């Protein structure tokens, strides 16, 4: 397994729409494993393939404290959503920035697992929020898209400043 490079906003590759996975095979499983490795290395709880410049409908999630409840969503479909909630979300592609994002409280999804077996999942709370956040990535949407243009511009400026400082340090 290897750690992949995470794309950072405003990289336009984050806006690409992911294609459905045609066949879950060894190559897809390797991508899934590398995505988990990357997510854990970056201390995240979810990662969409788009964020590592793989434009296929693959999501990995693990919201557990012990990093032992891996969830793989290949070609996820939202079947139902209900209620309203929201938390201050962060994103590995938008480092050190957080914002309140409105989300459905409960979701029901259908997807394929790491072995290509179909399953349905009904959930709420942090897992439901994380699923919605990662599914947004698959259609080129970021949490900053839910913000006002002014807030979005401020975040972009902060990230550009951070990138310049990091470039100088290296």
From Swiss-Prot:
Q: How is the cofactor bound?
A: Binds 1 Fe(2+) ion.
Residue spans making up a coiled coil are none
Instruction: Name the cofactor(s) required for activity, per the record.
Output: Fe(2+)
MF terms from GO for this chain are: metal ion binding; peptide deformylase activity
What are the GO BP annotations of this UniProt entry? co-translational protein modification; translation
Listed A to Z, the keywords are:
Hydrolase, Iron, Metal-binding, Protein biosynthesis
Catalytic positions are: 134
User: What's its catalytic activity?
Assistant: N-terminal N-formyl-L-methionyl-[peptide] + H2O = N-terminal L-methionyl-[peptide] + formate
Give me the residues that bind Fe cation, please. 91, 133, 137
Q: Which Pfam families match?
A: Pep_deformylase (PF01327)
Assigned EC number: 3.5.1.88
Q: InterPro entries in the record, alphabetically?
A: Peptide_deformylase, Peptide_deformylase_sf
Tell me which NCBIfam families the record gives.
Answer: pept_deformyl, PRK00150.1-3
> What is the protein's known function?
Removes the formyl group from the N-terminal Met of newly synthesized proteins. Requires at least a dipeptide for an efficient rate of reaction. N-terminal L-methionine is a prerequisite for activity but the enzyme has broad specificity at other positions.
* Protein name in UniProt: Peptide deformylase
Which species? Answer: Yersinia pestis
């Amino acid at each position: 397994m290897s750690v992949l490079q995470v794309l950072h906003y405003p990289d336009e590759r984050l806006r690409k729409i992911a294609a459905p996975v045609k066949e879950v095979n060894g190559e897809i499983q390797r991508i899934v494993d590398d995505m988990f490795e990357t997510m854990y290395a970056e201390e995240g709880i979810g990662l969409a393939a788009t964020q590592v410049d793989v434009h296929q409908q693959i999501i990995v999630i693990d919201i557990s404290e012990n990093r032992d409840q891996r969830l793989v969503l290949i070609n996820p479909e939202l079947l139902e959503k209900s209620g309203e909630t929201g938390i201050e979300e962060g994103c590995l592609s938008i480092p050190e920035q957080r914002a309140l994002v409105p989300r459905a409280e409960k979701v029901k999804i259908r997807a394929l697992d790491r072995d290509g077996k179909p399953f349905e999942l009904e959930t709420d709370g942090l897992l439901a929020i994380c699923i919605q956040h990662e599914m947004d990535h698959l259609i080129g949407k970021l949490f900053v898209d839910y913000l006002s243009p002014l807030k979005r511009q401020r975040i972009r400026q902060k990230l550009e400043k951070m990138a310049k400082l990091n470039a100088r340090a290296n």
